Structures are given as structure tokens and as C-alpha cells.
Amino acid sequence: MLTYAPLNFIAIGIGATLGAWLRWVLGLRLNGAGWPWGTLTANLVGGYLIGVMVALIASHPEWPAWIRLAAVTGFLGGLTTFSTFSAETVDMLERGVYATAAAYAGASLAGSLAMTGLGLATVRLLLR
């Protein structure tokens, strides 16, 4: 059972800070005028890592809650960003680059789902 224990708050805060910093760096390094590669990268990597974490947590029920909270709620919550993806897609639509917006939205959604499945499959294969 999850509680409002101080360790849980600290774990989420540290994880979220690290995830947000990584997303910020990816945006600075990779986002271009025509395509937000940094956001897409953050969401695809985050999708893969959430798959990995879900599989690992399922195979290790003895792990304390703060580990899941730090990794999933904190780090991956800070790394991935549905709101920035949405804003970037709407910006493309407002600029009239409809094909680019559709490609970006499709790549983000399908790619994130595929990467999550790949993360799950990776851990399941390694744990055999």
C-alpha cells in the first residue's frame, strides 16, 4: 500500500527533477524548427523505459514502493511529456503544416506504444 511517507515524496521529487532535466537537455540539443526531435526522443525513450519498469516491478514484488515512485512517477513522469507533444502538434496545425503534424502525432503515439511493448518484451526475454 502506498502512503504519504516522506521517503515517497523525496523519491518522486528526485526522480522528477532528473527526468525533467534530461527532457530539457534533449529539447535543447535535438529540437529543430521543423520537427521537435527532442520531445519525440524523450517520449520514445520514456515509452521503452516504462515497459522495462512495468516488467521489472511485476517480477520483483518485494521492491519497496519508493523505487517504483522514483523511477516511474518521478523520473519517467518528468521525462515524458504529453502536454509539450500536444502543444507542438497544435503549433504545426496552426502553421498549416498538416502533413508534418499528422506524421509527428502518429510517430509519437504509435512509437511510444511500440517502445513500451518492446521494453516489456526485452525484460521478459532477459528474465527467461
Curated annotation (Swiss-Prot):
Intracellular or extracellular location(s): Cell inner membrane
* Domain of life, source organism: Bacteria
User: According to its record, how does it sit in the membrane?
Assistant: Multi-pass membrane protein
Binding of fluoride 1 occurs at 43, 112
Q: MF terms per GO, please?
A: fluoride channel activity; metal ion binding
Keyword terms: Cell inner membrane, Cell membrane, Ion channel, Ion transport, Membrane, Metal-binding, Sodium, Transmembrane, Transmembrane helix, Transport
Domain text: Shows a double-barrelled channel architecture in which two fluoride ion pathways span the membrane, and the dual-topology arrangement includes a centrally coordinated Na(+) cation.
The further comment given in this record reads: Renamed the Fluc family to avoid confusion with the CLC-type F(-)/H(+) antiporters.
Family according to the record: Belongs to the fluoride channel Fluc/FEX (TC 1.A.43) family.
What PANTHER family does the entry give?
FLUORIDE EXPORT PROTEIN 1-RELATED
Identify this protein by name.
Fluoride-specific ion channel FluC
* Source organism per UniProt: Bordetella pertussis (strain Tohama I / ATCC BAA-589 / NCTC 13251)
Gene name for this UniProt entry: fluC
